[in-house]
Structure formats: structure tokens, C-alpha cells
């Protein structure tokens, strides 16, 4: 039987080159000694620590919190500033700015691999690119076409206007239905016709307008049929009456 000390005896210990996995023996039961890591083999600790630190810095919170070198920060800032100042600030109507933004701005048409631009320049480019015909813009309201009345409709309106300068709602409805027009068309025509009538009255020697400032008729501004007949009788009475025995002007001339 061979003893462990003899040359041919079998060795049950760890092979050479392998780490010793024997449990660490504590000298005391102090908390500081328990929490401290056991000392590793000489020379392997610095390399393992550096490798572990490198792996931790690739991913996770450590990578975000790790401080980057100052020179790399400075290089990135200089590159961004150079990319920004390639495009000068100009008003929105400048065509050169719109072409530059469309060629190099990300998010704009034709921007492939170009450096990013500030938000202000991107918004300016999009505002310039938007044309007036796009759905985002509001279209102007077109003017209403002017109503073309027929001769029969004009005759009916004029005939009614001679009798009645102002129409009530029932009268307007009846007139519109009889002439084949809408109430709005009749109302508009009456308003324009009254304005023309007021100008004619003022130009004919009238000192005051036949209507009030708000458009309401004044009292006795529109003569009635009875007043018209009385005026005709007064004009006939002013003419000189012919004497039966005297010859007329025509007979004297003969």
C-alpha cells in the first residue's frame, strides 16, 4: 500500500493551474471580515476586475451613468454646431432655405442620412413646403352670383314697388311665390330699389330723405292714392278757366 508521501502515490488534490476552491476560513466573526471578499490569486484580480467593469459599462445603468471623456463630448458638440450653421436663418419666404431644408432635413422629403436639424428649422421647412391648395389651408369663401331677373319678374317687382315701397312678411311671401323667386331675392331687390328711389327723391329737390336713418318710412313720405287724386285736382284748378264768350288762344292766332 502506497503512502501519500511516496513518489508513486495517487494525488487527490486539485490539478496544477486550477484555482483553489477551498472555503475561506475566517479569522474572526466580525462583520467587516464577513463582508469582505476573499483574496484571489495574485495577478488575476486586476485583470478580472477590469474585464468585469468593461462588461458592466456596455449595458445597464452603469453605461448611462459612466462619464464620457471630455474630448469626445467636445468633438460631438463641434460636429453638431457645424451641421446647424450650414443652413442660415432666413424668413419663411426665402427659397434658398426651403431647398436646403428639403435636401438635408430629417423628416422632410429627400433627407437620407443627413445630420439632424433644430426643431425651428424643421418647422420652417414644413411651413414653406405646405402649399395654399393643401387640405390644411382654409379656402376663401366665393362671392354669391348676382341674380338675373327676367323681364316678367322685373315688371312684377316694379309694379308692386309703385304701390308698396315696404313689404311685410306675408306680402313678401306672396310676391315671391307669384314671381317664382325666393324671399331673400325679393328682399334684396326691394332694398336696392329703395336706395335708388331715395337718391331720385333727393336729386329732385327734396330736402330730406323719405325714410328715417334706420330705414323706416317717415309719416306721409309715401303719398296715398287719395293724396295723389287731390294733387291732380289742385293742378287742374290752378289752370285758367276759359270764358264762354271769349275766343281761345288758337282762334286768336287764326
UniProtKB/Swiss-Prot annotation:
PANTHER family xref list? BARX HOMEOBOX 1 (PTHR24333:SF12), HOMEO BOX HB9 LIKE A-RELATED (PTHR24333)
GO CC annotation terms, alphabetical: chromatin; nucleus
DNA-binding region at which residues?
Answer: 142-201
Q: Which UniProt keywords apply?
A: DNA-binding, Homeobox, Nucleus, Transcription, Transcription regulation
- The superkingdom of the source organism is Eukaryota
Q: Where in the cell is it found?
A: Nucleus
Q: Which CDD domains match?
A: homeodomain
Which terms under GO biological process does the entry name?
anterior/posterior pattern specification; cell-cell signaling; digestive system development; endothelial cell differentiation; negative regulation of Wnt signaling pathway; regulation of transcription by RNA polymerase II; spleen development; Wnt signaling pathway
The protein here is known as Homeobox protein BarH-like 1
UniProt keyword DNA-binding, yes or no:
yes
